[in-house]
């Protein structure tokens, strides 16, 4: 089946590809946030290197809370200077008070040096109650150290190393439950080490090690996830050989077990072939194992460059994933994690395709489709009001998406995403809490040198609340505006309005989101 699909696709596109230019290059600069950092020209990463059509590949990492602060990525080339931009910022301090934010502050700083950069952040966000017992707070902080070697270094040339640590604590109440004053305190810490070298002509690799610990204070849930992952790719004259691997170890304490240990192993060996300078295919298999669960499936990926601007990607990748309680707590604060251990989530069939248009580093438009079928699709349901458990069901999921990315230019900066989703079980029931439509956009523009503006929108609709019910939450509409006015060098007066139209928003049944809120503050940059 896969061979027929690939053959048909090749017959359709090969005559067109043969007429195109074969040289595909990156420009001499990369836009990272507000400013431009010159890092020296590098070779374009071949399309077969991107072996999965992922969220990271297609969507930007967009710091909406900190537009003015430049996100500095460690240069790959040793000749790149981290501070070669005239407007380079090494720090930003924001502090503000609002109708419900009392107080809100965040600090970001960086200290670049030869062959590296040290970065840190800290934040506090205290929200007072807008309905009874809806008050909450968040405190977090972290630091990272990035190091890289020169391309001509005698030891591991062109290699990057990153050390990172982060800790946060948050507290909130189950204000839509039968016990509205019940307070959850969630503590989460993470330590990370990574190294990679993507500049090798014949061999590239990446390895990451992390340890994530999550604890619910005064609740019987503690989870530690130790995670090792990596990939390597060897380029030979006729083909490429690659392998991706991931090992996880969960140590869990909950209502039913204490210190229970579960292992998860995933691997994907592949072989890539270039059918032409612009057409690449990768074949292999996925294998996952955990306890008594095993999953095996063939894997196929194809990438095509029609031109410098236009490329097509397709992937067939059934696989299994290992998710613990911490994964679901990231999605739903009100998940009763102490009754859950983990899930070996299987996508028995899965494929995706995306078409991507790029104009240098200024404009990117991509869109496509995703499909998967699972015999144990997890979903949230409330056993009692305001408290959510997990169940699984056999389901199919169809998604169409488009992403619009207009990076900083004369017209400002604009990022937008739109997604339509249809996830249903075998009886045609919509799986709860899978929005049928999602739209987000952020637009920033500086009207003058002293006035910065940003408009953002989040829209969700078609959120069902039960598997056998047509009851849906009302559409979620959160329109926001941010203004920054320069009082004098390095100091800005800031205003932020969230939920501008004061819409009654809900993401989870019964839990009303923040109403219109105005926050005013100061921003100091250095």
What are these regions (language model features)?
Residues 110-127, 242-248, 255-288, 409-411, ...:
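Surface-exposed extracellular loop regions of Gram-negative outer-membrane beta-barrel proteins
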Residues 183-192, 208-279:
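Outer-membrane beta-barrel transmembrane domain signature of Gram-negative proteins
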Residues 97-101, 133-137, 155, 181-187, ...:
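Short sequence motifs at beta-strands and strand-loop junctions characteristic
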Residues 19-83:
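N-terminal periplasmic/intermembrane-space "pro-region" immediately following the signal or transit peptide
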Residues 127-142, 152-201, 212-225:
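Flexible loop and strand-edge segments within Gram-negative outer membrane beta-barrel domains
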Residues 74-77, 84-141, 159:
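Outer-membrane beta-barrel translocator/receptor signature
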Residues 82-89, 114-116, 150-160, 197-203, ...:
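Short loop/turn motifs that connect adjacent beta-strands in outer-membrane beta-barrel proteins
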Residues 93, 123, 284-289, 293-297, ...:
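Exposed, low-structure sequence patches enriched in small/polar residues
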